[in-house]
Amino acid sequence: MRYTPSVSGVRIPPSPQMFDKQFSRTDFDYWVTLATRWGDLDAMQHVNHAAYLTFMETARLEYYEYLGFENRNWDHKEGTILGSMTVYYHQQVLHPAQLDIGQRISKVGHKSFDILTGIFVSDKDIPALTATFTVVCFNYKKDTTIPVPDKIRDKCREL
């Protein structure tokens, strides 16, 4: 694939789409808005790939509260632990930018569920990044996995 300069001099090639679908804002149920910081940039002067993980972690913790999990779930019988993540970077983000982080439950299993996340620059309808987090339901007091609670199953809708 050949790269052609854009406004910033870098053009990022398209990445594979999860679920063979181009996501838009309507695909997400819960939103958190964050602003980029100068310290989020890398040597190429765009938001560093690792900064997105921090943005998504902040948003995911707010989403957990919305779903009914305690903020400090390690003190409770019903909590979560991150099992895995898959991240697709679709386009670069320049600073300063306001980021809208959309989330939704996209899949529910017996002891885990997936959270689909999209990061959108505030004036764009196509995400700059999409990610799937597999979250395992976990009892921290007993140090063991537990079944997914019904409150999570009730929040899942078809893509």
Annotate the PLM regions.
Residues 18-66:
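Catalytic strand-loop segment that frames the active site of acyl-thioester-processing enzymes
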Residues 18-32, 93-95, 105-159:
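HotDog/MaoC-like acyl-thioester-processing domains
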Residues 63-113, 128-131, 136:
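Hydrophobic beta-strand-centered segment that forms part of the acyl-chain substrate-binding groove
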Residues 34-38, 89, 137:
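Hydrophobic residues in beta-strands and at strand termini
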